[in-house]
Amino acid sequence: MKIDSPEFFNNREISWLQFNERVLGEVTDTRNPLMERFKFLGIFSSNLDEFYMVRVGGLKDEVLAGFNKPENKQQLTPKQQLRAIATKTKELVDQQYEAFKDVTQALKAEGISFLKHDELNEMQSEYVKTFFREQVFPVLTPVAVDAYRPFPMLSSKSLNIATALEAEDGSKRNLALVQVPAVLPRFVDLPVDDEETTAVILLEDVIISFIDSLFKGYHVLSAMPFRITRNADLPFHEEGTHDLLKLIEKELKKRRWGVGIRLEIQKNAINTNLLNMLRDVLDLQDRDIYAVDGPIDLTFAFAFYSQIGVEYDHLIYQTIMPVEPPALEKSKKLFDQILQQDYLLHHPYHTFDPIVRLIVQAANDPNVLAIKQTLYRVSGDSPIIKALKTAAENGKQVTVLVELKARFDEAKNIEWAKQLEKAGAHVIYGYSDLKTHSKITLIVRLQEGRIQRFVHLGTGNYNDSTAKLYTDIGLLTAKEQIAEDATNFFNWLSGYGEQPEWNALHTSPNSMLEKFLSLIDEEIKYHKKHGNGRIVAKMNSLTEKDIIVKLYQASRAGVRIELIVRGVCCLRPQIKGVSENIRVTSVVDRYLEHSRIFYFHHNGDDLIYCSSADWMTRNMRKRIEILFPIADEEQKNYIKDCLALTMADNVKAREQDDSGNYHYVTKGKQECESQILIQLYTNGKLKAKPSFEHPLEQKWTPVERAEEKITFDPTTSKK
């Protein structure tokens, strides 16, 4: 039997759509607070936008270039993948708008209404009329489309209205476009009689209601909202360039104007002539057109949530207060504490504050000589950037690798790079054709007359905002072997020369893949000898074929394998004779599962590694990543307990079957929602937990009312 046959794999693109389907499942999950369900509609839409701009855009490029080679797992050609994507996406979008109707109906029952113009009362009608005249009309620009004024280049993801016009005397018909201004809020908060209620109208509905005023002497026969998504998969041709920053700045300007790859139209406003015109101008096929049964672009759910939803605290998640890691005292200098022991941080259950505090203390400590750090994505008002600038201004040697090719953060990172350079930091951009995705900080300090190095390693970005929403692992250490590796790592990044030999770390694209394959091979050998082989791996996505085939070999040898893969999973479990010893689950909940953790039983030695890398082809072969060990037994036990809770999840976990489909995990006698229970466990408030050896055996009883045991942050409420 060939274990690398196409029938034993899932296609990457379809697997991603299945992940987004699980996100959509959070909209329909009535256990979630209502406004959170509405927000998940925005997450689904935002995810799909990026998928089309990057993945579908890349496949379209391959088709246009005449590239017809099948991908290396299911052996589907680019054209076959595009057809499969369109079929699955149309199915999901239909489900999304059914969910939108259900959620908005439920919001209406809570006193939150989305109104059409013909549903407004007299007071609201007058308000909207004035609002349009004073705030909307001045910024609108009607654009005629005819022989002298060709179809304009509309930017990607902009919302527009196509209009069919007829002269009042009936002498001629014309076409025109009106862009819905992105500078105005997408929804208008309306006056209401009852202060306990909220009513809004969407901006495009306001414009359509008064669109006649833009075309004097014409009747508007039809007004059809539409939205174009353009290819944003722009390759940066780095070879031969002398200034990567300027190259990327130049290429970014093209992103808004890439080839059209998707057209969204509003189903209840379709005009055949307008639709045909758009299809021809954009050179799209029927499968690229999505008629939606509701407002186009539900990403406005984010703004609605932050501006209106938060006023209804019974409709949103209660804020969980993160805790300081045990034994880490805020009153003491971090350097002194890290010298005494390693500290493991598990965000967002542990606060991200110690990481910020470390950089701030280093920036202002006269004994700190140098700070070196990699940055991939940071927050909009980053305290990390501020501290690094302060350090440079204080005369310290500051070296920062800013990854300019971080997708959709390129412009922000260019600005950060300029600011850091202006402050006196040495800014580098990494290696040609490789993204630096590693998360590492090295601080060099004069400690009692000798050089002492401090290191932070993590699975997630140095982003204080996403650290509240993403689960990640971080390690603070002063261990000499890791410190030496960190020094060599930064010297390799900033200088020339081959990658050094490592003491404790492993990196891609050089040694990490080989390390993982070796660890799996060792587990096979131990199982054949002792019968106790086991692998537990948690990650965002799994696409690397060499690792998948090696896991199949381990499964056939009898090794017990549990994979927690939130997103794409090209491995297919539970296939007799191939992967029957592999279980794959995915947890989608309030926090985005982002940590990468790898456990190998190793005949009782319990090897645990964390990494910035997933088991993906791009991470193993096209990015600079770091794999680091967890050595402390107490920290290893904590990670094993968290993995056990995640494997035992029967509320938010879905399990993949042998056909590649996902289903909710079967409920047992008691519910286990892993994120809630991990918070309790981290806070020291969980009375019992599942065993790591047998997490599915329900012989433990957690607290009965978990949510009451967590410390919540009080919020003001409208209701």
Curated annotation (Swiss-Prot):
Answer whether the UniProt record assigns the keyword Metal-binding to this protein.
yes
Record's GO cellular component terms: polyphosphate kinase complex
Q: Which cofactor does it need?
A: Mg(2+)
Q: GO terms for biological process? A: polyphosphate biosynthetic process
Which EC number(s) are documented for this chain? Answer: 2.7.4.1
| GO MF entries | ATP binding; metal ion binding; polyphosphate kinase activity
Task: Name the reaction it catalyses.
Answer: [phosphate](n) + ATP = [phosphate](n+1) + ADP
Keywords (alphabetical) are: ATP-binding, Kinase, Magnesium, Metal-binding, Nucleotide-binding, Phosphoprotein, Transferase
Catalytic site positions = 437 (phosphohistidine intermediate)
One Pfam family name is PP_kinase_C
Mod. after translation = An intermediate of this reaction is the autophosphorylated ppk in which a phosphate is covalently linked to a histidine residue through a N-P bond.
Top-level enzyme category: transferase
Residue positions binding ATP:
47, 470, 566, 594
**Residues the entry annotates as binding Mg(2+):** 377, 407
Please indicate if the UniProt record lists Oxidoreductase as a keyword. no
Write down the superkingdom of origin.
Answer: Bacteria
Please name the HAMAP family in this protein's record.
Polyphosphate_kinase
Biological role: Catalyzes the reversible transfer of the terminal phosphate of ATP to form a long-chain polyphosphate (polyP).
Q: What protein family does this chain belong to?
A: Belongs to the polyphosphate kinase 1 (PPK1) family.
Q: What is this protein called?
A: Polyphosphate kinase
